[in-house]
Amino acid sequence: MRIDVVTLFPELFEGFLAIGMVGRALASGALAVRTRSPREFGLGRHRSVDDTPYGGGSGMVMRVDCIVRCLEALDEAAAEGVASSAPPGADATASSGPLPRAHRVLLTPQGQPFRQEKAIELAARPAVALVCGRYEGFDERVRAFVDEEISLGDFVMTGGEVAAMAVIDACVRLLPGVLGNAVSAEHESHSPALAGLLEYPQYTRPVEFRGHKVPDVLQQGNHAAIARWRRAEAELRTAQRRPDLWRKARGGEPPADESGEVRR
């Protein structure tokens, strides 16, 4: 998979791309990442990429021409089979022939909420371009040159770089061979195997810590009983913590007693 990132601050990604699962994916060749700044296509001596908003208002707006030219440059580089950037010493950028045009994603609080289903969809694409905003946001016309808009949630940050890292991390762990145990991704919160439920509680040693014990059923080795317990706990946790997910998965309200408390 190839991921292009349009950002005014490529240096923010250096540490993120060098460590952990993302770093290993780059080193193995499962992932290639290129960052490029729209300032390369900025105007004037200072390479300006923003301007005052028409109609007045506070703040500065990112120019459509600088963003689009940056995206087009990435497409041109992909068409030429240009190798992507990678951490020092990592041979994650080998390319044979033209690379596909990236699916363009605008990172904005006005976008559709980013969910596991979207991560699965993006991870299946050969190439994705993530566009990070700054200042007061984008010129509205940028939206005519992207394929979709994604939001991390109902809050606003100073830029889209953290959102881009979240999208990259969520997608990379779904790539074949990246996660050490592929089964782990199949039985975690929001996974298809759990039908959209939250993951059941997990325990490890010690058996008891300051009065808190590992449930007996997990220590007895009865796999059928453990599976039933985990399913019941996943349902209970979802009903208690995310009734919206319960309604989506079950098509109704979580079971509750007369006081409104969710029942086991």
From Swiss-Prot:
Name one molecular function that GO assigns to this entry.
tRNA (guanine(37)-N1)-methyltransferase activity
Q: Does the keyword tRNA processing apply?
A: yes
Q: Which Gene3D superfamilies match?
A: 3.40.1280.10, tRNA(m1g37)methyltransferase, domain 2
One cellular component term from this protein's GO annotations in UniProt? cytosol
Q: Which GO terms describe its biological process?
A: tRNA N1-guanine methylation
Write down the chemical reaction(s) this protein catalyses.
guanosine(37) in tRNA + S-adenosyl-L-methionine = N(1)-methylguanosine(37) in tRNA + S-adenosyl-L-homocysteine + H(+)
Q: Name the residue ranges with Basic and acidic residues bias.
A: 240-251
- Compositional bias (Acidic residues) at which positions? 255-264
The EC number(s) attached to this protein equal 2.1.1.228
* Disulphide-bonded residues: none
Keywords from UniProt, A to Z, are:
Cytoplasm, Methyltransferase, S-adenosyl-L-methionine, Transferase, tRNA processing
Q: Which Pfam families match?
A: tRNA_m1G_MT (PF01746)
> Among its keywords, does the record have tRNA processing?
yes
Residues annotated for S-adenosyl-L-methionine binding in this entry: 133, 152-157
Q: What is its main location?
A: cytoplasm
Where in or outside the cell? Answer: Cytoplasm
UniProt region (Disordered), positions on chain: 240-264
* Function as written in the Swiss-Prot or TrEMBL entry: Specifically methylates guanosine-37 in various tRNAs.
Q: Which HAMAP family match?
A: TrmD (MF_00605)
Task: Describe the protein's quaternary organization and the partners it interacts with.
Answer: Homodimer.
Assigned protein family: Belongs to the RNA methyltransferase TrmD family.
Name under which the protein is recorded = tRNA (guanine-N(1)-)-methyltransferase
